[in-house]
Amino acid sequence: MEVSQFDNVSVVKKANLYFDGKCVSHTVLFPDGTRKTLGVIFPAALTFNTGAPEIMEINAGTCRVRLAGSEDWQTYGAGQQFSVPGNSSFDIEVQETLDYVCHFA
């Protein structure tokens, strides 16, 4: 899944701002109808809710993640990814700026 760039895509100019600007992303639309978001999360402890299943690919930085229903925290860094079921949530703790790609199923 790791690629250095996405070709032949459209990018929505308006940024997605969440949690008072602690998470900022842009939506990327692919010719086949799929979408991804490219973004950063600044240092914070946040809870995200999902509609569709997501795969979070970490490009830079590290984070701790706890999926809904779990008591265990997992640490992820550059080159790693984690999956979140649809209609669920996850907690994320970021100590340094996290650069990510969110792949929607």
Curated annotation (Swiss-Prot):
Q: Which enzyme type, at the first EC level?
A: transferase
Cystine links in this protein are none
List the catalysed reactions.
a purine D-ribonucleoside + phosphate = a purine nucleobase + alpha-D-ribose 1-phosphate; adenosine + phosphate = alpha-D-ribose 1-phosphate + adenine; cytidine + phosphate = cytosine + alpha-D-ribose 1-phosphate; guanosine + phosphate = alpha-D-ribose 1-phosphate + guanine
Listed CDD domains? cupin_PpnP-like
Supply the source organism for this entry: Cupriavidus necator (strain ATCC 17699 / DSM 428 / KCTC 22496 / NCIMB 10442 / H16 / Stanier 337) (Ralstonia eutropha)
Protein name according to UniProt: Pyrimidine/purine nucleoside phosphorylase
Belongs to which family? Answer: Belongs to the nucleoside phosphorylase PpnP family.
State a single Pfam family of this protein. Ppnp
Q: What does this protein do?
A: Catalyzes the phosphorolysis of diverse nucleosides, yielding D-ribose 1-phosphate and the respective free bases. Can use uridine, adenosine, guanosine, cytidine, thymidine, inosine and xanthosine as substrates. Also catalyzes the reverse reactions.
Highest taxon above the source species: Bacteria
Q: Does the keyword Transferase apply?
A: yes
Gene3D superfamilies per UniProt: Jelly Rolls
Name the EC number(s). Answer: 2.4.2.1, 2.4.2.2
Please provide one cellular component term from the Gene Ontology annotations of this protein. Answer: cytosol
